[in-house]
UniProtKB/Swiss-Prot annotation:
It holds the Pfam family FBPase_2. Its EC number is 3.1.3.11. One of its GO terms (biological process) is gluconeogenesis. The keyword Transmembrane does not apply. This is Fructose-1,6-bisphosphatase class 3. It catalyses: beta-D-fructose 1,6-bisphosphate + H2O = beta-D-fructose 6-phosphate + phosphate. The gene is fbp. Residues 298-307 have a biased composition (Basic and acidic residues). Pathway: Carbohydrate biosynthesis; gluconeogenesis. Belongs to the FBPase class 3 family. One of its GO terms (molecular function) is fructose 1,6-bisphosphate 1-phosphatase activity. Its cofactor is Mn(2+).
Amino acid sequence: MTQITERELKKKYLDLLSQRFDTPEKLATEIINLESILELPKGTEHFVSDLHGEYEAFQHVLRNGSGNVRAKINDIFKDKLSTKELNDLTALVYYPEDKLQLIKCDFQNYGQLNVWYITTIEHLIQLIKYCSSKYTRSKLRRALPEQYVFIVEELLYKNNEFKNKKSYYETLVNQVIELKQADDLIIGLAYSVQRLVVDHLHVVGDIYDRGPQPDKIMDTLINYHSLDIQWGNHDVLWVGAYAGSKVCLANLLRICARYDNLDIVEDAYGINLRPLLTLAEKYYDADNPAFKPKKRPDKHERLTQREESQITKIHQAIAMIQFKLEIPVIKRRPNFEMDERLVLEKVNYDTNEITVYRKTYPLKDTCFQTVNRDNPAELLPEEEEVMNKLLLSFQQSEKLRRHMSFLMRKGSLYLPCNGNLLIHGCIPVDENGEMESFEIDGQTYSGQELLDVFEYHVRKSFDEKENTDDLSTDLVWYLWTGKYSSLFGKRAMTTFERYFIADKASHKEEKNPYYHLREDVNMVRKMLSDFGLNPDEGRIINGHTPVKEINGEDPIKADGKMLVIDGGFSKAYQSTTGIAGYTLLYNSFGMQLVAHQQFNAKEKILSEGIEELSIKRIVDKELQRKKIRNTNKGKELQAQIDILKMLMHDRYLD
């Protein structure tokens, strides 16, 4: 193969570029455009975390931009519209299809409705003009309803200074109404407003878990205009299951059974659980209280006795398969330091006791019917067959493939973005605040380097789905449960103890020291520096651990350098957090933390008017308004400008 020098490579690159910019005028226009964009204010970033499958609450926060939509409406119309009119307009932007139907029922004749159409279209045009004031026209065009771009642009940029086009603009709107296009135009404009108030979305982990509709969240994210994802521990569990880890798959199914969410697997992703049910009904009883499914907060009707019986049996069957599958992984990976989790080998089956962490406990609610005392890791032939079938079904589910591929494409373990560090779980540290080391494949890693190696293995496992017991696949499971995992953030996962030991002291899962050290501003500054970020300007934006505001815990820690935005989207946590989640807004003026109250139903918003569910707290205000030049995107644009200027000097200037 011929070696190409750097000089030759540069020439070839400039040759290719010159085909696109084949005149100095074209090149100059592009440079002028990019240089000008750098001077625009940075767009609004929206941070959400720990969605846990709660689609209804998540999509409401997405539709209202964490209160940003209402704030923009108030800015323009608070002195022009009544409270009811403000509420109706806000609800229309949030849920345009539903609100339109309700509003249309209020009118007695078409004349009144047409007047409302004209007024509402004008209000939405004003709102779009205001929300898009820091965007280029080309960026705004991409946010407009595609089929009505011409009409909307004419209305946005109308200039009637000399009254020459008055009837032209009136005819535009009247024809939209006459041709029965007003509803579709209003719906399109409402979604344009939603899109314009948020430039970019950051999902700081855990789309999946116990909530009922993570698949709908994934579909929403796939269609979102601009976003990134920092994987959470539950997300990686699903990735691991799809990538070939049977122990991840067993964990995932156990959690779904525990929280009565098996319909995610069966109905949403089309996985046949009949073989697992057949196995469960053969070996397990329906009256084991430790394995009865938890009541779902979103389900009003109770499970039938038959449904509860089936789930209880499945729950036991998959839990025992999980504990068996963990044994060979732990034994072939001594560097995981997980010998204490060889739980089935630590059980005394004669006395019905277990000794873990040098303490012996009596066991309750046991279901060891399928365990071979002499070889607890051994799966029954039926268990092996069931897991093989389930893994094949997972890997052949088209919808799951699409969702997991999107998670990989848009996701990462952490993200440095615009001077901040976004990470779901933690950076593993010891009590002294030193980065903890972990050995992988004979080499020791810590800090950012450790997270990079973890991510490499997640991607490798995903690319090599046919390998089910290689190092990369085992490391995906380790990220779910290991003590040096940046996603788990605890010393051990006590799943077995929670099922079978009454003494709650044995259930305790000790957190990584990171979680108390993150209160210390110097520690946070050190972590930012270790990840190559400016500790004077940067912050760590964290999820994973619910903030117990009800007990006085503050999500703003370390003098504002650490922001924790898991406040409890998951209904299961809301009684302990006291709220229904935090989100974060970061625009060119600074940062605002938004605390959300529990979202009950959109019907109340539609019928009774807007009940604002958020309380904003200023985290900081920028001394100087931040421009695109100061962002990651700005650095990318500057790099493009530098190359284009190089081409200009090389080809067109003396």
